[in-house]
């Protein structure tokens, strides 16, 4: 976890600076902490998250969707699926929210230097992977080949589509897209991300994999990666589905004695592989 002296139990005021459609039913919400000193202290790693409060309604955890190195705003991908997110959708630029964080542990990017990176993103699970991609691109010579596998149920649910050309314009970066159900004008793969893994057959040599998506996707992606030669110690996952309080108090994200919100949400799969059947 990045060093911070922020109060992790009380929210800090933040103002919405931008809201835009990211995909069908998903918005990208950008906020800036009101206190300049709090902004300076809000240092985080790719993969960490924060609790976003809608005052008078409640709070929910969201993965940070932008790199801390790219300015003093925070971005979150919000899927309209519950009371808090419905109220977030009603807010606009200039409205205030509360922010608690940064929370959890992120990806140890320093450990990945010199490695080839294979990224697997499913649906809105691509949002916490965007700062990973940004970090690799901003420090391109520190990392080897970057391969991105991006999946969604349908083309209109793919996130950050306007950035794909920018990502792949960088040296030694390739991207493969797949959807469960293609539209007539779809020009990429159709099917599950597991089929895409088997199709491109990524080499496990000197490679780290990073995966975020629905739990069922993570489960079968891990099985498929093993099938093509990867071992659990090469695979990193972020597990966000059951988090609530963010500080290990409510117990909702307890998985076999492991608290996802405090010990994760990022894990080397080697640590959580015994809970594979829980990934549903």
List the predicted regions and their residue ranges.
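Ferredoxin-reductase
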Residues: 2-95, 154
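Short, charged beta-turn/beta-strand-edge "cap" motif at the junction between a beta-strand
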Residues: 56-58, 101-106, 279
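FNR/FR-type flavoprotein reductase catalytic core
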Residues: 83-244
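Local cysteine-cluster metal-coordination motifs and their immediate loop/turn environment
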Residues: 216, 240-265
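Non-heme iron-sulfur electron-transfer modules
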Residues: 256-280
């Amino acid at each position: 976890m990045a060093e911070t002296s922020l109060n992790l139990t009380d929210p800090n005021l933040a103002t919405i600076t931008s809201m835009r459609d990211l995909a069908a039913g998903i918005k990208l919400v950008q906020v800036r902490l009101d206190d300049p000193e709090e902004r300076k202290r809000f240092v985080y790693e790719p993969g960490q998250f924060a609790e976003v409060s809608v005052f008078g309604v409640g709070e929910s955890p969201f993965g940070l969707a932008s790199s801390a190195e790219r300015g003093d705003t925070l971005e979150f991908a919000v899927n309209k699926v519950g009371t808090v997110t419905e109220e977030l959708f009603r807010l606009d630029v200039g409205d205030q929210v509360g922010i608690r964080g940064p929370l959890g542990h992120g990806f140890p990017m320093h450990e990945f230097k010199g490695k080839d990176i294979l990224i697997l993103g499913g649906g809105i699970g691509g949002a916490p992977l965007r700062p990973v991609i940004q970090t690799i691109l901003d420090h391109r010579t520190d990392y080897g080949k970057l391969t991105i596998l991006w999946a969604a149920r349908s083309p209109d649910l793919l996130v950050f589509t306007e950035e794909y050309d920018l990502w792949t314009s960088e040296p030694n970066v390739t991207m493969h897209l797949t959807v469960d159900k293609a539209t007539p004008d779809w020009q990429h793969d159709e099917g599950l991300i597991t089929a895409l893994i088997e199709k491109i057959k990524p080499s496990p040599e000197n490679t780290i994999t990073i995966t975020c998506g629905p739990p069922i996707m993570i489960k079968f992606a891990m099985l498929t990666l093993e099938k093509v030669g990867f071992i659990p110690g090469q695979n990193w996952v972020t597990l966000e589905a059951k988090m609530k309080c963010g500080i290990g108090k409510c117990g909702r994200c307890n998985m076999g004695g492991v608290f996802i919100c405090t010990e994760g949400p990022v894990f080397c799969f080697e640590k959580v592989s015994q809970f594979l059947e829980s990934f549903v």
